[in-house]
């Protein structure tokens, strides 16, 4: 009985320790909490033309158009309903 209690105590301590370590964040150079990076620190001469266009606010390839998202959701919903009918 004593060994079972010790085993449960050790398991509980390890679980608490694992939970504490899993929520810790690794801080890399130039990164801030939440995954935000300092914009001024990333200045490389190898910046592509696409990134330069994004700085001007014209990066549509990074954000899908809302109409395409709604269209794909509707198509997926209709396809699921059609499969349920079969």
Swiss-Prot record:
Modification sites for Pyrrolidone carboxylic acid: 25
Name this protein carries in UniProt: Progonadoliberin-2
Chief localization: secreted
Glycine amide: residues bearing it: 34
Source domain of life: Eukaryota
Swiss-Prot/TrEMBL keywords: Amidation, Cleavage on pair of basic residues, Hormone, Pyrrolidone carboxylic acid, Secreted, Signal
Annotated gene: gnrh2
Purpose of the protein: Stimulates the secretion of gonadotropins.
Signal sequence, start to end: 1-24
GO CC field: extracellular space
Organism whose genome encodes this protein: Clarias gariepinus (North African catfish)
Single GO molecular function: gonadotropin hormone-releasing hormone activity
Compartments where located: Secreted
Family: Belongs to the GnRH family.
